[in-house]
Amino acid sequence: MYAVIKTGGKQYKVAVGEKLKVEQIPADIDAEITLDQVLAVGEGESIKFGTPLVSGASVKATVVSQGRHAKVTIFKMRRRKHYQKHGGHRQNYTELRIDAINA
């Protein structure tokens, strides 16, 4: 069984037992959270799509860790003008383990 969930403005296809990194969710490590924005649920050949959400469906997950992705380096430059600008960004994430899909 799998589900398509929406969290942090992005969509993810998840199945029970998977781990995935999503945009940061303010929760403690080992806390159980419920993701109720389920866009689709499928099992085998049958797929149930929501309009836009599947009513009564939810996904239970456990927070495994909180962290930061690798740095993305930004470099801006104007040719012949001696202008150079360096920057960087590290995005926060939450790693989840999917425990159950309720449809």
Swiss-Prot record:
<dbReference type="InterPro" id="IPR001787">
    <property type="entry name" value="Ribosomal_bL21"/>
</dbReference>
<keyword id="KW-0689">Ribosomal protein</keyword>
<protein>
    <recommendedName>
        <fullName>Large ribosomal subunit protein bL21</fullName>
    </recommendedName>
</protein>
<keyword id="KW-0694">RNA-binding</keyword>
<dbReference type="GO" id="GO:0005737">
    <property type="term" value="C:cytoplasm"/>
</dbReference>
<comment type="subunit">
    <text>Part of the 50S ribosomal subunit. Contacts protein L20.</text>
</comment>
<dbReference type="GO" id="GO:0019843">
    <property type="term" value="F:rRNA binding"/>
</dbReference>
<dbReference type="GO" id="GO:0005840">
    <property type="term" value="C:ribosome"/>
</dbReference>
<keyword id="KW-0687">Ribonucleoprotein</keyword>
<comment type="function">
    <text>This protein binds to 23S rRNA in the presence of protein L20.</text>
</comment>
<comment type="similarity">
    <text>Belongs to the bacterial ribosomal protein bL21 family.</text>
</comment>
<dbReference type="GO" id="GO:1990904">
    <property type="term" value="C:ribonucleoprotein complex"/>
</dbReference>
<dbReference type="InterPro" id="IPR028909">
    <property type="entry name" value="bL21-like"/>
</dbReference>
<dbReference type="GO" id="GO:0003735">
    <property type="term" value="F:structural constituent of ribosome"/>
</dbReference>
<dbReference type="InterPro" id="IPR036164">
    <property type="entry name" value="bL21-like_sf"/>
</dbReference>
<dbReference type="InterPro" id="IPR018258">
    <property type="entry name" value="Ribosomal_bL21_CS"/>
</dbReference>
<dbReference type="GO" id="GO:0006412">
    <property type="term" value="P:translation"/>
</dbReference>
<keyword id="KW-0699">rRNA-binding</keyword>
<dbReference type="Pfam" id="PF00829">
    <property type="entry name" value="Ribosomal_L21p"/>
</dbReference>
